[in-house]
Regions:
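Hydrophobic transmembrane alpha-helices of multi-pass small-molecule transporters
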Residues: 1-111, 236-375, 475-481, 485-499
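Membrane-core helix-loop-helix motifs of multi-pass transport proteins
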Residues: 182-266, 454-488
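C-terminal structured "cap/appendage" subdomains that terminate the fold
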Residues: 427, 435-468
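Transmembrane alpha-helix interface/packing and boundary motifs in multi-pass membrane proteins
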Residues: 68-77, 153-163, 200-211, 397-409, ...
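Helix-coil boundary and interhelical linker segments in multi-pass alpha-helical membrane proteins
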Residues: 228-233, 421-433, 498
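Transmembrane helix-bundle signature of multi-pass membrane transporters/permeases
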Residues: 117, 155, 173-177, 196-207, ...
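Alpha-helical transmembrane segments
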Residues: 107-117, 161-169, 237-253, 433-443
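Membrane-embedded alpha-helical segments and adjacent helix-loop junctions characteristic
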Residues: 49, 66, 79-80, 84-186, ...
Length: 499
């Protein structure tokens, strides 16, 4: 059965992105996707260039929006859309050819390649299967409890592994094995859809609750200290952010049960006794499992200590990406490793898809198109005329959905947090409260596969479609924004943050 799990990853269908979910709405989207994308491209490209937006930014905006339309509609394979985006970026002179092509060499591409290798190694060695069976028999007596256990693990890892992508690389192999045990078929099982999408969302929501969960959080803290004069500590962030994060995740879980109802699925009748028999049948740890465990623990330690290595070793440190490459190399090394290159089943169509997505997004940023859009949103809504309570809500919702325009948490933090601090000072509001609340939303990059590295890693399993993620992600973002807004007016006040 471990071989089947590997195949479930390698056979993930990236041809269109929306055929996985099925349904009339997706069929209509596929039919109108190409003409709609052409219309969007032509409209944005040929309209008079707005004041403050360069023509290069206008071209980047047209290409990005047209590509986004095709990715969501799934009218053509998503990797083909990425290739068209790269072609359009270069032929229109929006970016230089070298810049468009170099995205295939980004560190995230290496991380994704390494994630495929690590996943295949954990599966083939049976270590992932052993852990999954142990987890189910110990804590996951029902499918719902299994999902809750996975959410808990994601939140726990956020404290120890300061990288969203690293945590996804750890969790995906476990999820694949669990779904194999439950006989969930990629593209057909609602349980599979929900498990993978909850993985995406738990990763992001947990990150918002821990200051060290991502670099963007720490950048926000730095801006608040430098521009608002307040030093936000680890526990300050945790106490302010974690309650809304936990409530958001719980509500999202129950919404997911409604959106992806799996009660009619078969495969859950396999009794706990049989699962315990399977676990017992694995016997003692085998040599491949011991090798996999050593590689896994080494990888986890390097990921968890990334932020401290330079201080410990006089400026020397190993990044999350290099750690993944080292681990993948060990898995492939003759005599030491666990799998061959062919067994890794690396999906290069996914790499092309990701490269094109980053090329389009980076072009929007480098041409100042993204900054122009954010500027219009921040200063074009007439916030200075609104009541302070309304400003908080608008800013929180704006921050939450800003990843729909461009995806980098770091870039959005760098652009938006100083702008919100300045806005608060102008309006006589508390800049710390406004900036902190906005910062909690910036990790919610959960609505489309290109919006984060985590999304692409989970999307590679083939269990959910672009449209599945879009509808669930939008609901989760709305819930998160509402709860953070309520937290500002209640919980923040108890913690001493004034409006």
């Amino acid at each position: 059965m471990s071989g089947e799990a590997v195949k479930s990853i390698s056979s993930a269908d990236f041809s269109g992105g929306t055929e996985i979910g099925g349904g009339k709405s997706e069929s209509v989207l596929k039919k109108i996707g190409i003409p709609l994308a052409i219309a969007v491209f032509a409209l944005l490209l040929l309209m008079p260039t707005p004041t403050g937006l360069s023509y290069s930014g206008q071209k980047a905006l047209a290409i990005f929006c047209a590509a986004l339309t095709l990715w969501v509609a799934g009218s053509i394979p998503i990797y083909l859309t990425s290739m068209l985006a790269i072609i359009a970026l270069t032929l229109t002179g929006t970016v230089k050819e070298r810049v468009a092509f170099e995205t295939l060499g980004f560190d995230v591409i290496w991380l994704m390649v390494s994630a495929f290798v690590l996943t295949a190694a954990m599966v083939k060695s049976n270590l992932a299967r052993r852990f999954a069976l142990w987890m189910i028999t110990s804590f996951g007596g029902t499918p719902k409890r299994t999902l809750l256990v996975l959410i808990f693990i994601n939140f726990a890892l956020a404290f120890f592994v300061p990288s969203t992508t690293a945590r996804a690389s750890l969790m995906v192999p476990i999820c694949v094995i669990l779904l194999e045990i439950y006989r969930a078929v990629p593209g057909q099982s609602n349980f599979g859809r929900l498990m993978m999408l909850l993985g995406v969302q738990a990763d992001a929501v947990a990150t918002s609750g821990v200051m060290t969960g991502t670099a963007a959080n720490m950048i926000a803290v730095k801006f608040i200290k430098e521009q608002a004069g307040t030093d936000i500590g680890y526990m300050d962030w945790l106490l302010a952010a974690m309650p809304s994060a936990i409530l958001t995740m719980l509500l999202t879980f129950f919404v997911g049960l409604k959106l992806f109802d799996f009660r009619g699925e078969s495969g859950f009748s396999e009794g706990m006794a049989k699962l315990k028999e399977q676990l017992a049948g694995l016997g003692k740890l085998s040599a491949p499992e011991k090798k996999a465990m050593v590689i896994f623990v080494l990888t986890l330690l390097l990921w968890a200590t990334e932020d401290y290595q330079e201080a410990w070793f006089n400026g020397f440190g190993i990044s999350v990406y290099m750690t993944a490459v080292i681990a993948a190399t060990l898995c492939l090394m003759p005599g030491i490793g666990l799998i061959t290159w062919k067994e890794a089943n690396i999906k290069w169509d996914l790499m092309i898809f990701a490269a094109g997505a980053y090329a389009a997004g980076n072009a929007l940023e480098s041409t100042k198109g993204a900054q122009w859009i954010i500027g219009k949103l921040v200063y074009g809504l007439g916030l200075e005329t609104m009541a302070p309570a309304t400003v908080y809500v608008v800013v929180i919702f704006m921050s939450m959905f800003s990843h729909m325009i461009f995806t980098s948490k770091t870039v959005r933090t760098t652009i938006m947090i100083p702008a919100f601090i300045a806005l608060a000072k102008t309006l006589g509001m508390n800049p710390v409260t406004l900036a902190l609340a906005a910062s909690f939303t910036l990790t919610y990059t959960i609505t489309l596969p290109p919006h984060s590295k985590v999304n692409t890693i989970y999307f590679a399993t083939g269990y959910f479609s672009v449209l599945d993620q879009l509808k669930y992600g939008l609901v989760t973002c709305f819930i998160g924004a509402v709860l953070i807004s309520l937290s500002v007016f209640t919980w923040f006040r108890l913690l001493g943050y004034g409006l």
